[in-house]
A protein has these predicted regions:
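Nucleotide-activated donor-binding/catalytic signature segment of Leloir-type glycosyltransferases, i.e.
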Residues: 79-100
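Aromatic "clamp/platform" in nucleotide-sugar-dependent glycosyltransferases that forms part
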Residues: 115-117
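Conserved donor-binding/catalytic core segment of Leloir-type glycosyltransferases
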Residues: 29-46, 52-55, 67
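Short alpha-helical donor nucleotide-sugar binding micro-motif in glycosyltransferases
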Residues: 97, 104-109
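Short hydrophobic beta-strand element within catalytic cores of glycosyltransferases
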Residues: 134-137
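A charged, aromatic-enriched C-terminal amphipathic alpha-helix characteristic of glycosyltransferases
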Residues: 170-194
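Glycosyltransferase donor-sugar binding loop
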Residues: 18, 39, 65-79, 95-96
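A short, active-site helix/loop in glycosyltransferases that binds the activated sugar's phosphate group
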Residues: 1-9
Length: 194
């Protein structure tokens, strides 16, 4: 009765892309290869220019390598944003990669970083939980909805550096677990089908 819209369908598929990410994450080795993974994009909300400025605000002796993921075919645009500041070749801009490669990048990061002015949902944070990584992120409402022991917020440079420094010295506090979203999804499906 609740699925009347689909009454003529033989099959109803309700996709959830996190299940694919989680399935791969569950069989991917988690390591700390010592890099900061910035999951970003080129949209205005991602504020990539400011994120790169934050990275270069870290004193050089405390800066770990940075990998920037999520800009697809905009690698050249990201290199222009970096604008010759990467004198020690510590930044790698990653173009399009497979989901397996994305999960591996998360799984091997020291810290996952999500810098944004606005999001509809904190996907990067959810994915970091699935790979048992600490997250450094801007204090925006979509990210605060993902609050957990592995999430460290910042609103300004000094807070960014304080949390970055803490995370460099401390291992992740997260254990493998099911996302709250998965539990809610399963609960709602039970309501529909029971």
């Amino acid at each position: 009765k609740k699925l009347a819209l689909f009454k003529n369908a033989e099959t109803v598929l309700l996709p959830n892309p996190f299940f694919s990410f989680e399935k791969i994450a569950n069989v991917t080795k988690k390591e700390d290869l010592g890099y900061l993974l910035l999951v970003s994009g080129l949209g205005a909300n991602k504020d990539l220019h400011t994120a790169v400025d934050y990275y270069f605000s870290i004193p050089p002796e405390k800066r770990i390598p940075l990998k920037i993921l999520g800009c697809g075919n905009g690698v050249d645009k990201v290199i222009n944003i970096i604008n010759g500041r990467d004198l020690n070749n510590q930044i790698e801009v990653i173009g399009f990669v497979s989901l397996n490669e994305v999960v591996t990048l998360y799984s091997n990061a020291k810290i996952v970083w999500a810098h944004s002015l606005a999001e509809g949902y904190g996907r990067t944070l959810a994915e970091a939980k699935l790979t048992c990584k600490n997250v450094l992120c801007t204090r925006i409402s979509a990210f605060r909805e993902q609050d957990d022991v592995n999430i460290y917020y910042y609103s300004y440079y000094s807070e960014f550096f304080k949390n970055y420094s803490y995370l460099i010295e401390n291992p992740p506090h997260v254990v493998e677990k099911t996302l709250r979203e998965h539990l809610l999804f399963e609960t709602e499906l039970r309501k529909i089908y029971e």
